[in-house]
Curated annotation (Swiss-Prot):
Keywords: Aminoacyl-tRNA synthetase, ATP-binding, Cytoplasm, Ligase, Nucleotide-binding, Protein biosynthesis. ATP binds at R264, A265, E266, E351, I352, S353, S354. Homodimer. The tRNA molecule binds across the dimer. This is Serine--tRNA ligase. Pfam families: Seryl_tRNA_N, tRNA-synt_2b. It catalyses: tRNA(Ser) + L-serine + ATP = L-seryl-tRNA(Ser) + AMP + diphosphate + H(+); tRNA(Sec) + L-serine + ATP = L-seryl-tRNA(Sec) + AMP + diphosphate + H(+). The lineage of its organism: Bacteria, Pseudomonadati, Myxococcota, Myxococcia, Myxococcales. Its EC number is 6.1.1.11. InterPro entries: aa-tRNA-synt_IIb, aa-tRNA-synth_II, aa-tRNA-synth_II/BPL/LPL, Ser-tRNA-ligase_type_1, Ser-tRNA-synth_1_N, SerRS_1_N_sf, SerRS_core, tRNA-bd_arm. It is an enzyme of class 6 (ligase). L-serine binds at T233, A234, E235, E287, S386. It comes from Anaeromyxobacter sp. (strain K). Belongs to the class-II aminoacyl-tRNA synthetase family. Type-1 seryl-tRNA synthetase subfamily.
């Protein structure tokens, strides 16, 4: 959430910065301006009324010594003035509540280092690791490979849960567990503390990281009141862990990694990635989260990006890093890098991680702070990134590591987690006859 005082003091600057995101961001900010002006008026009026109240109190004390007959009339005037103060305070409270509601749907202004642009076509490739492998055959997409190997099952999953769900069988299920363990081991060796968070959280928790109120249609929630929400990413519970806390500067940065299932309604994604496991209602991910000093968040962002890239480098998967333009960034982010892994069966680079610096945008909502050099509490900066998406790593392994005979070579770092298994070959599983 934006700082109301800062917005009110220089509205045009925020309007100009948000315009880089697109007209929608400017429109979201527009109603704030007249209400901020009304807030200033009410604050001036309240200050004036309280000054008059203090003067009236002093006058009553003086009259009590010099003119007792006039005291009752002065007290009546003071009571009337008190009623006016209460009315002004109530009006101010209403205005501030509405301002908070409005600011909850205004996105984070992009950092100055973010390139201009409207959408994914304006993103900037900043570096590439590895090369596209030359195949002596036409590489297949992962959905064809998974079906031929018998390890990815959609028909039975649809029977259980509908579209955008997948059952992993045999070697694919083992591969998923191996990837998770490998990712966690790499990240903890690089200074992250492992967290296993709750998968159901409150509305306040969802609001803290920016999913609510703007993106409720993308979430799954329970029907009880108040509802609980299934997390769309471990960023939500892990970032909120330190809500209303103050750190000593010496404790920063705080670094966490967390494995969790993620649940997303994928509203607005009809017709996109309907085949395979690229876009699911339920998937697994290892998330990286940091709380940083304000002056160190840019450097910590680059470190987090490198940590996410490291797991892909060790697996030998070809990928590139893309700096998102202002119009393509997520709601809470001030700057985001996407890591895109090469999928030869699809002939495209596909996102496998987003690594974002939210600066103090989330911290203002959850009130997480640290003591600065002067000892005064200062808002922390929050950072998050996929380290990385597990299902999409399976996609990359299936497509990049496929052989002409239809088998898939398992990257060497994962083999110890899979009992030494070196490749995935076709498997046959029991299946009944449909009645």
């Amino acid at each position: 959430m934006l700082d109301l005082k800062a917005v009110a003091a220089d509205f045009e600057s925020f309007e100009r910065r948000l315009a880089r995101r697109g007209e929608g961001a400017v429109q979201a900010l527009a109603p704030v301006k007249p209400l901020a002006a009304r807030r200033r008026e009410l604050n001036v009026l309240l200050e004036k009324q309280k000054k008059e109240q203090a003067e009236a109190n002093a006058n009553i004390r003086q009259l009590a010594r010099t003119d007792k007959d006039a005291v009752e009339g002065a007290r009546a005037s003071l009571r009337a003035l008190g009623d006016e103060v209460k009315k002004t305070e109530a009006a101010l409270g209403d205005v501030e509540a509405e301002l908070t509601r409005l600011l909850m749907v205004v996105p984070n202004p992009p950092s100055d280092s973010v390139p201009d642009g409207k959408d994914e076509h304006d993103n900037v490739v900043v570096r590439t690791w590895g090369e596209q492998k030359a195949y002596g055959f036409t590489p297949k997409p992962h959905w064809e490979l998974g079906e031929a190997l018998g390890v990815l099952e959609w028909q039975q999953a649809a029977k259980l849960s509908g579209s955008r769900f997948t059952i992993l069988k045999g070697a694919a299920a083992r591969l998923e567990r191996a990837i998770v363990s490998f990712f966690i081991d790499v990240h903890t060796s690089r200074g992250y503390t492992e967290i296993l968070p709750p998968y159901l959280v409150t509305g306040e928790t969802m609001t803290g990281t920016g999913q609510l109120p703007k993106f409720e249609e993308d979430l799954f929630k329970t029907t009880n009141e108040p509802p609980m929400y299934l997390i769309p990413t471990a960023e939500v519970p892990v970032t909120n862990m330190h809500r209303d806390e103050i750190f000593e500067a010496s404790a920063m940065p705080v670094s966490y990694c967390a494995f969790s299932p993620c649940f997303r309604a994928e509203a607005g994604s009809a017709g996109r990635d309907t085949r395979g496991i690229m876009r699911q209602h339920q998937f697994h991910k290892v998330e990286l989260v940091k709380l940083s000093k304000a002056e160190e968040s840019e450097a910590e962002h680059e470190k987090m990006l490198d940590d996410a890239c490291e797991v892909l480098r060790r697996l030998g998967l070809h990928f590139r890093v893309v700096l998102l333009c202002a119009g393509d960034m997520g709601f809470s982010s001030a700057k985001t890098y996407d890591i895109e892994v090469w999928c030869p069966g699809q002939g495209a680079y596909r996102e496998i991680s987003s690594v974002s610096n939210c600066e103090d945008f989330q911290a203002r909502r959850i009130r997480v702070r640290y003591r600065g050099e002067n000892g005064k509490p200062r808002l922390a900066h929050t950072l998050n990134g996929s380290g990385v998406a597990v299902g999409r790593t399976i996609v990359a392994i299936l497509e990049q590591c496929q052989e002409a005979d239809g088998t898939v070579v398992i990257p060497e770092p994962l083999r110890p987690y899979m009992g030494g298994l070196e490749r995935i070959a076709a498997e046959t599983f029991p299946r009944g006859v449909e009645r």
